[in-house]
A protein has these predicted regions:
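Secondary-structure boundary elements
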Residues: 101, 132-136, 167-170, 211
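Outer-membrane beta-barrel transmembrane domain signature
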Residues: 24-60, 64, 70-85, 145-218, ...
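Outer-membrane beta-barrel architecture
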Residues: 94-96, 123-129, 161-165, 205-209, ...
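N-terminal signal peptide c-region/cleavage motif recognized by signal peptidases
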Residues: 18-21
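A short, polar/proline- and glycine-enriched secondary-structure boundary/capping micro-motif
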Residues: 117-118, 185-186, 228-232
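Glycine- and aromatic-enriched membrane insertion/assembly motifs of diderm outer-membrane
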Residues: 81-135
Length: 239
Protein backbone atom coordinates (compact mmCIF):
# COMPACT_ATOMS: atom_id res chain seq x y z
CA UNK A 1 0.00 0.00 0.00
CA UNK A 2 2.81 2.42 0.85
CA UNK A 3 4.51 1.79 -2.47
CA UNK A 4 1.26 2.34 -4.39
CA UNK A 5 0.61 5.49 -2.39
CA UNK A 6 4.09 6.79 -3.17
CA UNK A 7 3.84 6.37 -6.95
CA UNK A 8 0.20 7.30 -7.44
CA UNK A 9 0.16 9.92 -4.72
CA UNK A 10 3.12 11.85 -6.10
CA UNK A 11 1.57 11.83 -9.58
CA UNK A 12 -1.78 13.14 -8.28
CA UNK A 13 -0.12 15.81 -6.12
CA UNK A 14 1.95 17.03 -9.08
CA UNK A 15 -1.17 17.15 -11.26
CA UNK A 16 -3.12 19.11 -8.63
CA UNK A 17 -0.46 21.77 -8.12
CA UNK A 18 0.09 22.08 -11.89
CA UNK A 19 -3.66 22.56 -12.35
CA UNK A 20 -3.88 25.17 -9.59
CA UNK A 21 -0.99 27.10 -11.15
CA UNK A 22 -1.92 27.01 -14.84
CA UNK A 23 -5.53 25.90 -15.31
CA UNK A 24 -8.42 27.92 -16.73
CA UNK A 25 -11.22 28.03 -14.17
CA UNK A 26 -14.79 27.19 -15.14
CA UNK A 27 -17.00 29.84 -16.77
CA UNK A 28 -20.36 31.08 -15.44
CA UNK A 29 -21.81 33.18 -18.29
CA UNK A 30 -25.22 31.73 -19.23
CA UNK A 31 -26.39 34.35 -21.76
CA UNK A 32 -26.28 32.90 -25.27
CA UNK A 33 -27.86 34.08 -28.55
CA UNK A 34 -29.09 30.56 -29.29
CA UNK A 35 -30.89 29.58 -26.10
CA UNK A 36 -31.66 25.91 -25.37
CA UNK A 37 -33.54 24.94 -22.22
CA UNK A 38 -32.01 21.45 -22.31
CA UNK A 39 -28.47 22.81 -22.58
CA UNK A 40 -29.17 25.32 -19.81
CA UNK A 41 -30.40 22.55 -17.50
CA UNK A 42 -27.30 20.46 -18.20
CA UNK A 43 -25.18 23.56 -17.49
CA UNK A 44 -26.86 24.02 -14.08
CA UNK A 45 -26.52 20.30 -13.33
CA UNK A 46 -22.82 20.51 -14.16
CA UNK A 47 -22.37 23.49 -11.84
CA UNK A 48 -24.21 21.58 -9.12
CA UNK A 49 -21.79 18.67 -9.56
CA UNK A 50 -18.85 21.06 -9.18
CA UNK A 51 -20.43 22.74 -6.16
CA UNK A 52 -21.10 19.64 -4.04
CA UNK A 53 -18.45 18.23 -1.72
CA UNK A 54 -16.11 15.32 -2.36
CA UNK A 55 -16.99 13.60 0.94
CA UNK A 56 -14.21 11.08 1.55
CA UNK A 57 -14.79 8.05 3.74
CA UNK A 58 -12.27 8.33 6.60
CA UNK A 59 -12.42 4.97 8.40
CA UNK A 60 -9.81 5.27 11.15
CA UNK A 61 -9.32 8.96 11.99
CA UNK A 62 -6.00 9.57 13.70
CA UNK A 63 -6.67 13.31 13.96
CA UNK A 64 -9.62 15.41 15.08
CA UNK A 65 -9.53 17.64 12.00
CA UNK A 66 -8.50 17.33 8.35
CA UNK A 67 -7.83 20.31 6.09
CA UNK A 68 -7.27 20.08 2.36
CA UNK A 69 -7.50 21.37 -1.18
CA UNK A 70 -9.58 19.98 -4.01
CA UNK A 71 -10.37 20.28 -7.70
CA UNK A 72 -13.45 19.26 -9.70
CA UNK A 73 -14.27 19.13 -13.40
CA UNK A 74 -17.14 17.97 -15.64
CA UNK A 75 -17.20 16.02 -18.89
CA UNK A 76 -20.30 16.02 -21.12
CA UNK A 77 -21.54 13.07 -23.17
CA UNK A 78 -22.70 15.23 -26.11
CA UNK A 79 -22.03 18.73 -27.52
CA UNK A 80 -23.55 21.58 -25.51
CA UNK A 81 -23.99 25.33 -25.96
CA UNK A 82 -22.15 25.81 -22.67
CA UNK A 83 -19.30 23.42 -23.47
CA UNK A 84 -16.67 26.09 -22.86
CA UNK A 85 -18.12 27.18 -19.51
CA UNK A 86 -18.24 23.58 -18.29
CA UNK A 87 -14.74 22.60 -19.41
CA UNK A 88 -12.79 24.45 -16.70
CA UNK A 89 -11.77 23.38 -13.21
CA UNK A 90 -13.31 24.47 -9.89
CA UNK A 91 -10.94 24.80 -6.87
CA UNK A 92 -11.91 24.56 -3.20
CA UNK A 93 -10.51 24.41 0.31
CA UNK A 94 -11.91 21.90 2.78
CA UNK A 95 -12.15 21.11 6.48
CA UNK A 96 -13.52 17.95 8.11
CA UNK A 97 -13.84 18.16 11.91
CA UNK A 98 -14.76 15.11 13.99
CA UNK A 99 -17.40 15.81 16.63
CA UNK A 100 -17.48 12.19 17.81
CA UNK A 101 -15.74 9.05 16.51
CA UNK A 102 -18.61 8.48 14.06
CA UNK A 103 -19.90 11.97 13.29
CA UNK A 104 -17.99 14.81 11.65
CA UNK A 105 -18.63 18.27 10.24
CA UNK A 106 -17.99 18.93 6.53
CA UNK A 107 -16.96 22.40 5.36
CA UNK A 108 -15.91 23.65 1.91
CA UNK A 109 -15.14 27.15 0.65
CA UNK A 110 -14.01 28.50 -2.72
CA UNK A 111 -13.35 31.90 -4.29
CA UNK A 112 -11.81 32.53 -7.70
CA UNK A 113 -12.01 34.79 -10.76
CA UNK A 114 -14.06 33.65 -13.75
CA UNK A 115 -13.78 36.18 -16.58
CA UNK A 116 -15.15 39.38 -14.97
CA UNK A 117 -16.90 37.67 -12.05
CA UNK A 118 -15.62 36.75 -8.60
CA UNK A 119 -17.24 33.42 -7.83
CA UNK A 120 -17.91 32.42 -4.21
CA UNK A 121 -19.14 29.08 -2.94
CA UNK A 122 -19.46 27.60 0.51
CA UNK A 123 -20.77 24.26 1.73
CA UNK A 124 -21.48 22.84 5.15
CA UNK A 125 -22.95 19.58 6.37
CA UNK A 126 -22.45 16.43 8.38
CA UNK A 127 -21.34 12.86 7.72
CA UNK A 128 -22.16 9.79 9.81
CA UNK A 129 -19.94 6.74 9.41
CA UNK A 130 -19.88 3.19 10.72
CA UNK A 131 -17.42 1.86 13.25
CA UNK A 132 -14.13 0.24 12.28
CA UNK A 133 -15.20 -3.34 13.14
CA UNK A 134 -17.52 -3.95 10.16
CA UNK A 135 -16.76 -5.87 6.98
CA UNK A 136 -17.85 -3.04 4.68
CA UNK A 137 -17.46 0.39 6.32
CA UNK A 138 -20.19 2.82 5.27
CA UNK A 139 -20.87 6.53 5.39
CA UNK A 140 -23.87 8.74 4.75
CA UNK A 141 -23.73 12.53 4.44
CA UNK A 142 -25.87 15.60 3.87
CA UNK A 143 -24.26 18.84 2.63
CA UNK A 144 -25.89 22.24 1.96
CA UNK A 145 -24.26 24.18 -0.89
CA UNK A 146 -24.45 27.80 -2.02
CA UNK A 147 -22.96 29.54 -5.09
CA UNK A 148 -22.95 33.32 -5.59
CA UNK A 149 -20.93 35.89 -7.53
CA UNK A 150 -21.83 35.23 -11.19
CA UNK A 151 -23.82 38.15 -12.63
CA UNK A 152 -26.29 35.85 -14.40
CA UNK A 153 -27.47 33.45 -11.69
CA UNK A 154 -27.21 32.10 -8.14
CA UNK A 155 -27.38 28.43 -7.17
CA UNK A 156 -28.27 26.44 -4.06
CA UNK A 157 -28.30 22.68 -3.61
CA UNK A 158 -28.60 19.89 -1.07
CA UNK A 159 -26.27 16.93 -1.58
CA UNK A 160 -27.07 13.45 -0.19
CA UNK A 161 -24.68 10.50 -0.45
CA UNK A 162 -24.46 6.93 0.81
CA UNK A 163 -21.25 4.98 0.21
CA UNK A 164 -19.39 1.87 1.32
CA UNK A 165 -15.67 1.07 1.26
CA UNK A 166 -14.44 -2.20 -0.25
CA UNK A 167 -10.93 -3.56 0.15
CA UNK A 168 -9.68 -4.89 -3.21
CA UNK A 169 -6.12 -6.23 -3.03
CA UNK A 170 -4.07 -3.26 -1.76
CA UNK A 171 -6.65 -0.64 -2.73
CA UNK A 172 -9.62 0.88 -0.91
CA UNK A 173 -12.50 1.46 -3.33
CA UNK A 174 -15.45 3.69 -2.50
CA UNK A 175 -18.82 2.82 -4.13
CA UNK A 176 -22.07 4.63 -3.52
CA UNK A 177 -25.14 6.53 -4.66
CA UNK A 178 -25.88 10.23 -4.51
CA UNK A 179 -28.61 12.77 -5.09
CA UNK A 180 -28.33 16.52 -5.74
CA UNK A 181 -31.43 18.69 -5.29
CA UNK A 182 -30.77 22.11 -6.82
CA UNK A 183 -32.48 25.47 -7.17
CA UNK A 184 -31.15 28.19 -9.51
CA UNK A 185 -32.30 31.80 -9.82
CA UNK A 186 -31.49 33.80 -12.98
CA UNK A 187 -30.95 37.56 -13.15
CA UNK A 188 -31.13 38.03 -16.93
CA UNK A 189 -33.50 40.59 -18.47
CA UNK A 190 -34.36 38.30 -21.34
CA UNK A 191 -37.85 36.91 -21.89
CA UNK A 192 -36.42 33.74 -23.42
CA UNK A 193 -34.70 32.76 -20.18
CA UNK A 194 -36.56 31.37 -17.17
CA UNK A 195 -36.43 33.25 -13.89
CA UNK A 196 -35.76 30.07 -11.91
CA UNK A 197 -35.02 26.39 -12.35
CA UNK A 198 -35.27 23.43 -9.97
CA UNK A 199 -34.39 19.78 -10.35
CA UNK A 200 -32.68 16.66 -9.06
CA UNK A 201 -29.65 14.66 -10.14
CA UNK A 202 -29.18 10.98 -9.25
CA UNK A 203 -25.76 9.49 -9.80
CA UNK A 204 -23.39 6.60 -9.08
CA UNK A 205 -20.24 7.39 -7.11
CA UNK A 206 -16.90 5.62 -7.52
CA UNK A 207 -13.69 6.62 -5.75
CA UNK A 208 -10.44 5.44 -4.20
CA UNK A 209 -8.72 6.17 -0.89
CA UNK A 210 -4.94 6.60 -0.64
CA UNK A 211 -3.87 7.22 2.96
CA UNK A 212 -0.56 7.22 4.79
CA UNK A 213 0.03 8.69 8.23
CA UNK A 214 -2.00 11.91 8.34
CA UNK A 215 -2.05 12.52 4.55
CA UNK A 216 -4.87 11.37 2.30
CA UNK A 217 -5.62 11.58 -1.43
CA UNK A 218 -9.17 10.90 -2.63
CA UNK A 219 -9.96 10.80 -6.38
CA UNK A 220 -13.66 10.40 -7.16
CA UNK A 221 -15.92 10.02 -10.21
CA UNK A 222 -19.69 10.61 -10.39
CA UNK A 223 -21.65 9.04 -13.25
CA UNK A 224 -24.86 10.66 -14.51
CA UNK A 225 -26.66 9.91 -17.82
CA UNK A 226 -25.78 13.37 -19.21
CA UNK A 227 -22.36 14.05 -17.69
CA UNK A 228 -19.46 12.78 -15.59
CA UNK A 229 -18.11 14.72 -12.64
CA UNK A 230 -14.51 14.10 -11.58
CA UNK A 231 -12.83 15.44 -8.46
CA UNK A 232 -9.72 14.91 -6.38
CA UNK A 233 -8.98 16.06 -2.85
CA UNK A 234 -5.79 16.04 -0.78
CA UNK A 235 -6.03 16.31 3.02
CA UNK A 236 -3.71 16.76 5.99
CA UNK A 237 -4.63 15.66 9.51
CA UNK A 238 -4.17 18.21 12.31
CA UNK A 239 -4.99 18.27 16.01
Amino acid sequence: MIKNFSVTGKWIVSLMFFTFAFSQWAGYDVHQEEYSSTDLRIFIEGKTFGLSANSSLIISPENRAYVGIGLSKNTLFRPNTYQKQLSGWVPNFSADIFITNNLYFIGRISQFYSEEDIVHSHNFGFALKSGEDVSYPWQTSVVFCNLSGPRDFALRSVSLTMAILIQAADHQIQIGLGKEMYSAKFFLEDANFPTAMKGEINYILLGMNFERDSIGIFPQIRFHPRLIGTSVRMTWGIG
